[in-house]
Structures are given as structure tokens and as C-alpha cells.
Amino acid sequence: MRTATIKRKTKETDIAVSVNLDGTGASDVATGIGFFDHMLDLLARHSGIDITVKANGDLHVDHHHTTEDVGIALGQAVKQALGDMAGITRYAGVHLPMDETLSRVVIDISGRPVLVFKVEFPRDKIGEFDTELVREWFQAFAMNAGITLHVETLYGENSHHISESCFKGLARALRAAVAIDPRANGAVPSTKGQLGG
């Protein structure tokens, strides 16, 4: 099974993350940030990846450290669970609607971390959650998962819907990209014979 557990402890956060890439989309998430928990639950459900996140952070300061560090740990867990990436589909893209919002998410599990994030929010906050932290999370996740990730909201008016379409779009793209391609016969999907270099 393609699983991994990452523990990360700093002076700002104490985080434990587990993933099962071949799961059923089960989630057990507690970060102390309600909206963020909701996004991570959506990520698990729509990716089919089982995700457990337990985080204690300096929420008395703000949500930044917890959000970013969960992205770091979750990215590291996905990378570890992928192993040598043999047999994976590698590329995937999706257009994800959420009511009036449409976002496009395209992924390459390349071993080369890049984030292109073209998303604008009409509001600074969703409840108590700073919308600028959505990009911070995607940046931390992409860099530590070692993936090339393009996220663009084509249009949308509601900040909650925009964020949700981005997380769900990532989920559906991940679901397809990490899937084992039966035609690959276990080969690494690269003419170089390896990914990440």
C-alpha cells in the first residue's frame, strides 16, 4: 500500500499527517481552523486519498503557521507515499465548477516543484480565515510534494466557492495523477526512466 506518515514539530506548530493514496477518501482532520478543516475534508473525499491531520499551532498569533506547515507535512507525506512513482498516470487536469465559480487545476507529478496560482478573492476573509492563506497552502503543498501545479480560477464571485473549487480541483487532479496506469506495466512515466531530475 502507498502510505506515509509525517510528523513535524517546530516552536510554532506540532503536526502529524498520514495518507493512504489507495484509500476511500476518509478523513480525520483537526487543525483548530474550521474552514481549513473543511477544505482538507473535501481534499480527502474527492481525491480518494485517506487523510489524517492532527495539528496544534500558535492560533493565538494567526492561522498562517498552521496552514503553511500542514501544507508542508501533507506534501511530504504524498511524496513519500508515491515512492519511485513507478506506474503512476503522472499528468491530470480538471475543470471544477462550484456554483458560479469555475477553476482549472492541472498537475504533473514530475519531481520538479512549481506552483502557478492565478486566483483572486473578492474578500480578504472567509469567516476568520485569511484568503491569502489559500495560496500559502498550495505553495507549501506543491513544493514539498515535488509536483508541478497550475491553479487558475477562470471566474467566480464568492470567496468560499473559489477556495472550494481550487481544493476540489486539486483533489480530482490528484486522484487521476496518482492512479496506477495499467498500461504502464510498472514503468516510471518518463523517457529518462526517472522523475525528479
Swiss-Prot record:
Catalytic activity, EC: 4.2.1.19
Coarse class of the protein's main subcellular location: cytoplasm
Biological processes per GO annotation: L-histidine biosynthetic process
Pathway it works in: Amino-acid biosynthesis; L-histidine biosynthesis; L-histidine from 5-phospho-alpha-D-ribose 1-diphosphate: step 6/9
Enzyme class: lyase
One CC-aspect GO term: cytoplasm
Protein name as it appears in the record: Imidazoleglycerol-phosphate dehydratase
Organism for this UniProt entry: Afipia carboxidovorans (strain ATCC 49405 / DSM 1227 / KCTC 32145 / OM5)
